């Protein structure tokens, strides 16, 4: 797998905070949700907000979205769901085989141009401390983020990430 050089995922400061709070609150399972934003004419994703979704499996190694929850969010943000995220609380540092199959199915077979963020654990901080640290402007512990997109012609590619400052 190669890193796609020309495209980026831009993540707003507010979206990043929501991602971090979600993965730390649900640190024992694969936290998951969708990314809200836009895709520009060059194929760059701009994540402006995050909408956490329930993982009905409550599993540290597997996630799925409840289809009704996903439909509700899609209706709430028409044409603005641009991707999905989930955590790997066990620290697995790349897309799993299941992740890869789902990325190919969504991006290539269904032709949905989502970007995929994986946030790697472990997430061993108390979420209430994270909120206090945010309020005091302290530095949050930053887990590693990986972004992917599965292109029809290039296969699975890692996408560069850029996080906006506050």
Outline where the language-model segments fall.
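Conserved beta-strand-loop surface patch within small alpha/beta domains used
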Residues: 1-81, 90-166
């Amino acid at each position: 797998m190669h890193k796609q050089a020309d495209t980026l995922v831009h993540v707003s400061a507010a979206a990043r905070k929501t991602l971090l709070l979600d993965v730390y609150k649900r640190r024992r399972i694969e936290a998951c949700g969708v990314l809200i934003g836009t895709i520009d004419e060059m194929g760059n994703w701009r994540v402006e907000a995050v909408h956490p979704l329930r993982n009905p499996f409550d599993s540290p190694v597997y996630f799925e979205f409840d289809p009704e929850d996903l439909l509700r969010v899609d209706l709430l943000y028409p044409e603005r769901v641009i991707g999905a995220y989930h955590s790997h609380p066990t620290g697995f540092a790349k897309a799993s085989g299941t992740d890869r199959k789902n990325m190919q199915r969504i991006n290539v077979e269904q032709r949905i141009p989502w970007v995929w963020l994986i946030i790697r654990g472990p997430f061993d901080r108390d979420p209430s401390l994270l909120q206090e640290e945010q309020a005091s402007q302290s530095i949050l512990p930053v887990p590693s983020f990986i972004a992917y997109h599965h292109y029809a012609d290039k296969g699975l590619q890692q996408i560069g990430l850029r996080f906006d400052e506050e």
